Amino acid sequence: MTGPHSNIVHVIGAGLAGSEAAWQVAKAGVPVMLHEMRPDRMTEAHRTDGLAELVCSNSFRSDDAANNAVGLLHAEMRRLGSLIMRAADANQVPAGGALAVDRDGFSAAVTKALNDHPLIEIARGEIAGLPPADWGNVIVATGPLTSAPLADAIRELTDENALAFFDAIAPIVHRESIDMSVAWFQSRYDKVGPGGNGADYINCPMTKEQYEGFVAALIAGEKTEFKEWETNTPYFDGCLPIEVMAERGPETLRHGPMKPVGLTNPHDPTTKAYAIVQLRQDNKLGTLYNIVGFQTKLKYGEQQRIFRTIPGLEKAEFARLGGLHRNTFLNSPKLLDGQLRLRAQPRLRFAGQMTGCEGYVESASVGLIAGLYAAADARGETLASPPATTALGSLLGHITGGHIETIEPGTRSFQPMNINFGLFPPLASAPTKKPDGTRLRGNEKTVAKKQAMSALALADLDRWIADHLRIAAAA
């Protein structure tokens, strides 16, 4: 590593946010020390020492930049030279309208890029407690599984209890163990996505009787017991365990991950399934499939017993069973400033899921902007924030000031959030007419509004890049 010691940016945690942050700092010509505690100290969810390991789904969700907020975030990150998006694009697997990746190939690509960069040094070992006082420019991206000593140190520094919720992991099945005389390949509404062909999911149909028996088994199944300190931790609604969804009502799953719409069983095309379980490709070879929406806290034996009652999965062999881990995040609007710095100690900047964003892409995007801010600090410059009209700017706004504490005071009023168009400022003038001059009606208005917001976001981001950002050539 070259460059003066005082200019080094320390990034703690090499998940998606930390990896992206380190990449952006180095790409701007500033040296980086990237700290990762694995494999010296593992977490309850990680299984490798690879950087940017995906511990939950392998999906980056929609890649549609014109109509979907997360697809727009993909596009913005690509414009900013995101390593995470580059690795995802290079390791994509078919997934209908979504961008899904081979998790091992993805992690390997990120690890290699960071290892090979001359301005990045990777230090393996835990940072126990706050970073040393002489580290003047630090990005803390330790994620939802932050080790206890560091979490305790942050809590003491801020005099604020970290918030927490549970995040559950879906099981992965070996493709060859799925009975394709019962199941079939099809994407919902035959939608074609990145690297896909419109038949990217494996579908397992259920009759009404099978569905009702399955729901009853989920509710009755033996669950993982909570530790005493975990009993009051809420779930994030975007990653609810399937048995918790089942407990909310007998029809909940049929209107959620098991909805039977947009699919036709080629084995029995005249019979409409009452519910359908979908599996999504999990690796590039197509040998592993994860059960979509089936994150769970059922005990391992119960998972195998209950999930093998699904038609087509009677002989399923599991590469990984579902699990549960505790996620922690900060009350960011109160604790962080507009550039993600800790108000109580501005040398510390936070990034990723612990800031209160939810999702792989969102975490990486906050790492991206944190890296740009830190690089500017190292050069003695101040970087203007991305426009609020962009996906990056709107997510940053939610984290650092988008929540009005006085409306709903209390320790749990700020909650994790996926990127969505509801975080964007309203359009000054929403479209009302089609290109041919006829009036937009019903859902057409919603579609046109999203497309207008996306177009404005990309135009404003391009102007911001040109006006405020020095994009160094990737090493």
UniProtKB/Swiss-Prot annotation:
Protein EC: 2.1.1.74
Single Gene Ontology BP annotation: tRNA wobble uridine modification
InterPro entries, alphabetized: FAD/NAD-bd_sf, MnmG-rel, MnmG-rel_CS, MnmG_N, TrmFO
Classification via Pfam families: GIDA
GO molecular function, one term: flavin adenine dinucleotide binding
Signal peptide (UniProt feature, chain positions): none
Residue runs in coiled coils: none
Entry's localization field: Cytoplasm
Record-level GO cellular component terms: cytosol
Catalytic activity: uridine(54) in tRNA + (6R)-5,10-methylene-5,6,7,8-tetrahydrofolate + NADH + H(+) = 5-methyluridine(54) in tRNA + (6S)-5,6,7,8-tetrahydrofolate + NAD(+); uridine(54) in tRNA + (6R)-5,10-methylene-5,6,7,8-tetrahydrofolate + NADPH + H(+) = 5-methyluridine(54) in tRNA + (6S)-5,6,7,8-tetrahydrofolate + NADP(+)
Role description: Catalyzes the folate-dependent formation of 5-methyl-uridine at position 54 (M-5-U54) in all tRNAs.
Similarity annotation: Belongs to the MnmG family. TrmFO subfamily.
Family annotation (NCBIfam families): gid_trmFO, PRK05335.1
Protein's recorded name: Methylenetetrahydrofolate--tRNA-(uracil-5-)-methyltransferase TrmFO
Organism: Bradyrhizobium diazoefficiens (strain JCM 10833 / BCRC 13528 / IAM 13628 / NBRC 14792 / USDA 110)
Gene (UniProt): trmFO
